[in-house]
Design a protein with these regions (language model features):
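S-adenosyl-L-methionine-dependent methyltransferase catalytic core, i.e., the SAM/SAH-binding region
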Residues: 1-314
Length: 314
């Protein structure tokens, strides 16, 4: 079923993130998280003749939202949809003959569509197959991880990607339960892990559990790293990077690249002790959703927007 863009995903920090791009005439812009098309639609509304927008999304469901954007003929000519993981940003820009870009926007995390889809296993609210793939054409599933990973590897991803303090005990219980069952649905997982979560924190901890599996399934941190490094190379001097994150792992990586120019956050200095970084921070403090937006869209509560501008070569 084709959904409207608004139903698919309500764009978070829409005005703030688009203003952060500082869009100008004849610019080339990239939205690496098309989703419901909300951010892309707003960018297109500000583009003029000679400008172009490339929008990425690896999910076939997202591509259907193009028809709901109501684009004019001029906007269609200025728009290219790329059905691909954004980790391949550099390759696709080379394919389209784009040497430099003037701005890149990323609204990271999972769209409302994925959380609310009762068939793909992204949420513990529904009984569904343990899939969690953004790209349904390839890759391992959450069920594969739960059934095949050894205890140590499983514990590591729960700790690193879910920040679960009981990761070792939970992993041990998951592996032990394999003797009685094969993990196929979300309920198969929940019956194993529920005893480890206090009722007061049950929903938060379950969300962290599902987050850890989703990140591993989709190689999200590796993809984000590759995209940010590519963006650093592709942005021309004065170009803007506008990124919305939803959890601490994403935010730390984005913060590091903007402040130091590398994923590790290692500060480099020149001969005179001056800090060398390719970016100038546009906002020193993260931008968060207003109280009004949080009331209208509860999923915006954890959103953090960071904006940086590529420096001129010195």
């Amino acid at each position: 079923m084709i959904k409207t863009a608004e139903c698919y995903h309500i764009p978070v920090l829409l005005n703030e993130s688009i203003e952060g791009l500082n869009i100008h005439a004849n610019g080339v812009y990239v939205d690496v998280t098309f989703g419901g098309g909300g951010h892309s639609q707003e960018i297109l509304s500000r583009l003029t003749e000679g400008s172009h927008l490339y929008s990425f999304d690896q999910d076939a469901d997202a591509e259907q939202n193009i028809d709901n954007m109501g684009l004019s003929e001029e906007q269609v000519d200025r728009f290219t949809f790329v059905r691909s993981n954004f980790r391949y940003l550099k390759n696709w820009m080379r394919y389209y003959g784009v040497e430099y870009i003037d701005g890149l926007l990323a609204d990271l995390g999972v769209s409302s569509h994925h959380f609310d889809d009762e068939t793909r296993g992204f949420s513990f609210r529904f009984e569904a197959p343990l899939d969690m793939r953004m790209n349904k054409r390839a890759g391992i599933t959450a069920a594969d991880i739960l059934n095949d990973y050894d205890e140590e590897r499983l514990a590591d991803i729960l700790y690193l990607y879910g920040e679960l303090k009981q990761s070792r005990r939970i992993a041990s219980a998951i592996v032990k339960a394999r003797g009685q069952k094969t993990y196929k649905t979300t309920n198969d997982l929940l019956t194993t892990i529920e005893p480890f979560f206090q009722r007061a924190r049950e929903k938060k901890d379950m969300a962290k559990m599902f987050q850890a599996l989703r990140i591993e399934v989709n190689h999200e941190m590796d993809a984000l790293k590759e995209m940010l490094m590519a963006a650093t190379e592709l942005l021309r001097p004065g170009g803007r990077l506008s990124v919305i994150t939803y959890h601490s792992l994403e935010d730390k990586m984005v913060k590091n690249i903007m402040k130091s120019g590398n994923i590790e956050g290692k500060v480099k200095q020149d001969f005179f002790g001056r800090i060398e970084t390719p970016f100038r921070l546009v906002n020193n403090k993260v931008i968060t959703a207003s109280n009004d937006e949080q009331e209208r869209n509860p999923r915006s509560r954890s959103a953090k927007l960071r904006i940086a501008e590529k420096k001129a070569n010195e």
